[in-house]
């Protein structure tokens, strides 16, 4: 299973599924990361956390632990 955490800088991927439960999953989906949406990885902080993404035309930063819950198709 490929997750958003595995995506390389400068690449685009499509979300297949958002894993997790409860408030964490809801928060990810509230940020606009839902099934079928395209995500572009702009950059990653020097220590790998957080990751800066472009989602639905806006900039978004998420933690690696949240990125692991997002299954992608590169």
Task: Mark where each language-model region is.
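Compact, glycine-rich, soluble single-domain proteins
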Residues: 1-74
């Amino acid at each position: 299973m490929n997750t958003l955490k595995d995506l390389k800088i400068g690449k685009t991927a499509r979300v297949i599924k958002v894993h997790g439960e409860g408030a964490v999953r809801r928060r990810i989906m509230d940020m606009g990361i839902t099934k079928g949406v395209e995500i572009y990885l702009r950059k990653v902080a020097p220590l790998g956390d957080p990751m800066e993404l472009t989602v639905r035309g806006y900039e978004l930063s998420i933690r690696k632990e949240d990125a692991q819950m997002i299954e992608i198709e590169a």
